[in-house]
Regions:
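Membrane-proximal extracellular/periplasmic loop immediately following the first transmembrane helix
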Residues: 37-107
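Short, solvent-exposed loop/turn elements at beta->coil junctions and helix N-caps
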Residues: 104-110, 141-144
């Protein structure tokens, strides 16, 4: 019986080739679009390293200042200063961990070699490593003591370490950024650019 169905289907395809091609292409395109939408939803909602605890995250993206006067409509929105983060968020007791960060692009160089390629830099604190579970391939993150002391330490992704030193083994080596010499303390696996909160190529203390 199934062979008969297959023969009939093949015969119909041969009789109406153009219509069959359009129908099959349309069905395949619709299925592909559904799969893409499901994939995008999973990427944005499912937790995986370095955002394994994504379902427990709470984000505060900026601040808003508005007038207290009755009927006042004056408002000002923007990012947060480090003082706001320290006074309003570091003092919280309920969260297991709190972290502040900002991102920028900047070129990196070696002490004896000027380079011009720019990388995505994440200026953050020691709390970042408690929230995001980056898989380290060498070394480890900068500590709270390093952050408080303003010691110029740096964590690189594998790709950046390879670009700069030709190998992923970079702990203890020095990198120059904006005329400041940083010491590499750790190397992590590359972070997919689809992870908006944890994506970066270089991590340094914003202190």
């Amino acid at each position: 019986m199934y062979k008969q169905y297959i023969k009939q289907a093949v015969q119909m395809l041969r009789e109406n080739t153009l219509v069959s091609i359009i129908s099959i292409s349309g069905t395949a395109l619709a299925i592909a679009m559904v799969l893409v939408m499901v994939l995008v939803f999973q990427i944005k909602s499912t937790g995986y390293a370095p955002e394994s605890n994504r379902s427990r995250f709470m984000y505060v993206w900026g601040t808003e200042v508005s007038s207290k006067s009755p009927g006042g409509s004056d408002r000002n929105r923007g990012g947060m200063s480090s003082e706001v983060v320290k006074e309003c968020f570091y003092t919280l007791r309920k969260p297991e961990a709190v972290s502040g960060y900002c991102s920028d692009s900047h070129s990196l160089s070696l002490p004896n070699r000027r380079l011009f390629k720019e990388y995505e830099i994440c200026y953050t604190d020691a709390g970042h490593w408690k929230i995001f579970d980056h898989p380290f391939v060498e070394g480890g993150p900068f500590s709270e003591a390093d952050f408080q002391s303003g010691i110029p330490k740096m964590v690189l992704s594998e790709q950046v370490a390879t670009d700069l030193f030709g190998t992923g083994q970079a702990v203890g080596r020095q990198v120059v950024m904006d005329f400041i010499t940083f010491t590499v303390c750790g190397v992590v696996r590359d972070v997919p650019s689809s992870l908006m909160s944890s994506y970066a190529q270089v991590w340094i203390p914003y202190s």
